[in-house]
Amino acid sequence: MANRTIVAFDFGTKSIGVAIGQEVTGTARALTSFKAQDGTPDWQKVEKLLKEWQPDLVVVGLPLNMDGTEQPLTARARRFANRLHGRFGVQIALQDERLSTVEARANLFDSGGYRALDKGSVDAASAVIILESWFDEQAG
């Protein structure tokens, strides 16, 4: 297994969560979340984050319906991933993110009750789940 640094994004139209992980350990942790204007982040903040962490790969969560079909937000997440690649030249992987927000909310509630459920924390925790599920798939 490679020792790559990987950043994951949980794309949303109002907020985008971010997590960081190491492929060699298969672990991830929440970094931050960015406000978004109708799905468009502050690209300067994204650039600063990518320069700081210098990931070898960026994983973007792909919001699918429960039956695996695409929804309008799926195309927007793909566009976000394409823009990340185009602007910053980073390698991109897309990862099914079904139920990641539900799982993130449950995990945060278990650790801190309702006070832990602010939007930024949920989005960053969702990015962790997206990255961990990507690690699990790579491990086979």
From Swiss-Prot:
Query: What family does the database annotate?
Result: Belongs to the YqgF nuclease family.
Please give the positions of the paired cysteines in each disulfide bond.
none
Question: Is the Metal-binding keyword given for this protein?
Answer: no
Classification via Pfam families: RuvX (PF03652)
Which keywords, in A-to-Z order, does the entry hold? Answer: Cytoplasm, Hydrolase, Nuclease, Ribosome biogenesis
SUPFAM superfamilies with a match to the protein in the record: Ribonuclease H-like
Any Gene Ontology biological process: rRNA 5'-end processing
Q: Does the keyword Nuclease apply?
A: yes
State its role.
Answer: Could be a nuclease involved in processing of the 5'-end of pre-16S rRNA.
Q: Which InterPro entries match?
A: RNaseH-like_sf, YqgF, YqgF/RNaseH-like_dom, YqgF/RNaseH-like_dom_sf
In short, the EC number is 3.1.-.-
Where is the secretion signal located?
Answer: none
What HAMAP family does the database record attribute to this sequence? Nuclease_YqgF (MF_00651)
Write out the annotated subcellular location: Cytoplasm
Root EC class:
hydrolase
What's the name of its gene? yqgF
Q: Its Gene Ontology molecular function terms?
A: nuclease activity
Per the record, the major location class is cytoplasm
Tell me which GO cellular component terms the UniProt record holds: cytosol
Q: What is this protein called?
A: Putative pre-16S rRNA nuclease
